[in-house]
Amino acid sequence: MQLKKTQSEIKDIWKNREKFNDCNLKKTARIAIKEVIELLDSGKIRVAEKLSSGEWVVHKWIKQAILLHFLTEENKIIDNTNCWFDKIGNKFSEWNEEKFRRLKIRAVPGCFVRRSAYIGTNVVLMPSFINVGAYVDSGTMIDTWSTIGSCAQIGKNCHISGGVGIGGVLEPIQASPVIIEDNCFIGARSEVAEGVVVREGSVLGIGVFIGASTKIIDRETSKVFYGEVPPYSVVVPGSIPSKNNISTYCAVIVKKVDEKTRSKISINEILRD
């Protein structure tokens, strides 16, 4: 019941955001917005969630709350040995050793997680950047120099390899976030953006780029997909003939994940301890 009340408040505040010069409105708004940010931060709510049908629903009002958070906050010094100047603080700035141990989160020097991003248990964060409203589920590793964009949803037991870009989406507000479902492996220097959904158990090879308009072609059936990688697909970069003897980029599903593939990408439990 309280969540529905907060949702209604956020929607009303969003409609009246042009009136934020009114200090009283700004003060009232902060209470509701802070509640949403704390719920996001604890993982009790998320920007997108999977329905029993297998479809993903995006909660627009939560994205609105994140944007309103930027409107209501002032830039401030964020001092945590290093020094930054931003509206959104470091998720871990007030954490102590006991909390890290209890949640079994390993955060390597050089990683930065903005407040309102949720990090599940047994997650390993190498030097990487996790943006506002993102959701990183349990058992996942975010490898070096990877970026998880605003509101992106990363499933359980995923490996996001070095230098990967997972696109964010707070603008335009109606767009869906990138979703990487459970047990996926995203190869180094790959980029997934524009609301693409990578379904459970899929493997993207090194340097695969997928946006909403990228052709994803199944080599065996010649079927073309847009915006979604089917479950348990092994995907590599490719090209397809176009007009005037010019080839254009595409992503190619070369096979379904098999035991040989699984052995190459299996999680190293030693690194998760």
Curated annotation (Swiss-Prot):
Major site of localization recorded for this protein: cytoplasm
The record's Gene Ontology cellular component field reads:
cytoplasm
What does the record give as its pathway? Amino-acid biosynthesis; L-lysine biosynthesis via DAP pathway; LL-2,6-diaminopimelate from (S)-tetrahydrodipicolinate (succinylase route): step 1/3
Name the UniProt key words of this record, in alphabetical order. Acyltransferase, Amino-acid biosynthesis, Cytoplasm, Diaminopimelate biosynthesis, Lysine biosynthesis, Repeat, Transferase
* Subcellular location as annotated: Cytoplasm
Q: Please give the InterPro entries that the UniProt record associates with this protein.
A: DapD_Trfase_Hexpep_rpt_fam, Hexapep, THP_succinylTrfase_dom1, THP_succinylTrfase_N_sf, Trans_hexapeptide_repeat, Trimer_LpxA-like_sf
What top-tier enzyme class does this entry carry? Answer: transferase
Reaction(s) the record says it catalyses: (S)-2,3,4,5-tetrahydrodipicolinate + succinyl-CoA + H2O = (S)-2-succinylamino-6-oxoheptanedioate + CoA
Show the Pfam families listed in the entry. Hexapep_2, THDPS_N_2
Tell me its EC number(s), please. 2.3.1.117
Q: Which residues bind substrate?
A: 106, 143
UniProt-listed HAMAP family:
DapD
What's this protein's family per the entry? Belongs to the transferase hexapeptide repeat family.
Quaternary context = Homotrimer.
Query: This chain belongs to which protein, by name?
Result: 2,3,4,5-tetrahydropyridine-2,6-dicarboxylate N-succinyltransferase
> Native species of this protein?
Wolbachia pipientis wMel
